[in-house]
UniProtKB/Swiss-Prot annotation:
Its main location: cytoplasm. Pfam families: AdoMet_MTase (PF07757). The gene is TRM44. This is tRNA (uracil-O(2)-)-methyltransferase. Transmembrane segments: none annotated. Belongs to the TRM44 family. It is found in: Cytoplasm. It is an enzyme of class 2 (transferase). GO terms for biological process: tRNA methylation; tRNA nucleoside ribose methylation.
Amino acid sequence: MTFEFCGGESSILGGAWVCIYQTAEDVGFQREHFEQAMDNVIRHPNINSTVLLRADIVAEREYDCRTGEAVRDGNCGAAADVAEGMLSVGLEDVAARSVHTELDLAVKLEFVRRLVPRNPYKDALINQTCLVLNTREPSETALVVYLPHFSEREDCPFYIPPVAAVGILLHGGRLSVHYIPFAGEGAALADEGQRAVRTARRLLQTAEKHSKGCMNGYTKRVEHDVVVDKVLFQERYIQLKKKYSQWLVDNWAESTDPRKHVFEDIAIAAFLIELWSKIYGQHAEDKFRFCDMGCGNGVLCYILLMEGYAGEGIDARRRKSWGMFPENVRSCLKEQLVIPSLLLRPHPEIRKMASHMEHNGGFFPVHVSSSQLMAPATIVYSAADLITSPQVNIAEFPPNTFLIGNHSDELTCWIPLLGQPFMVIPCCSHNFHGARVRYRPSRESATRLGNSTYAGLVDYVEYLAKAVGWETEKEMLRIPSTRNAAIIGYKNPALGQFPTQQVYDEVLKNGGAEGWIQSATALLKGTPKSH
């Protein structure tokens, strides 16, 4: 679709308005498609600006265009609170505003929304009226208007155009964007290089693209905010980012990009804290402990520990970043190999008959090579030695433990089998030997996530969890990663009875786990992975 710059020409909407951009030809979609698309954009302003986190709908009303009478008041949730230090402009003004046009239009939908930026300590929260107007008689004309609740140019935050009103018009088969400029600023809108003019083009592109999507029957591939409420998560994220992000970025000790890892782990911490509040209720931090299996750089553990949650992180290799944390955090980060106890303990049925048996008598050869050896050698570990080794964690946790697998790679498929409530965010696909493998995705997952190794892994982890009795939930996390599916399980009738026979059966169905100890010891020599 080609867009024509109007150069600040007079607008069909009237003398106060200025036309900025319009489509060069008919758009092809109908008014209903335009209104459906713009309703979604009004409710999700982050579509137009990545600076914005969300919109809280303060008021919503529908009118009969012919009579002007209100026919529906929408149910509106609470608007965002403004914490100390956050910026805001005119939030006490919640009365819907109106606008004059020379077209014979009447209000169909009226919203007052509160725009919440990602960093409200830098960008101000504002209220804004959003109107959807139609002609009184049936036609294909519709207008969407945005009216900020301030009247001075100086009050305008960076994330919206610096104008008094924005109009997106569908009329005569074409789409166009119009502004009402602040006093004395109309001449600047004739310059295509101005930020407000460039923004008008993006607004037109978004409206045209999303309207065509509605016409073509577009549906979202994934749903967010299924398990944890979006507002609760986002408010928690803002709090944690304010407290921890700057220090973590400034003191980053790894060679990886600090901003990606820091903000991703802050988002995961925010999600976990709200999830735990949902599961355990008030004062959740007093009711359980966490274990982050494959904790990597330790940032997630650091945030959770600093927020008052008891727990620990385990990884096969110590990271440089561990040294930057305070002693109370460093003492909770453990350099250990995870070797699940079901590989070392007697089968539960055998222990019933011989309760004195602490290990299964197994021996595990591990091939090693070194420049200090005359030739490759084999070390044989016994189950008894591995159970008592301080360098090994056999994943026998207290009953009030919640397991976290945040891109935990080789451990991912093991975590649902360990008999504790868990959240796993799969990343790289491995079997119970620790070897790379590709699992086939279901038809549904292939449609939503693509016919990929990742989709297959997510499906397999969910299958494993259900096979051993977990009621599972899935959430597509709001994190800066394409591998953002979280599988969650915290209800299981067999809780306290693991490892069950189903656990042994699933390990055997997937080829057993004889190679796990060899693979686990190899992790000690490899380079730590970065996701």
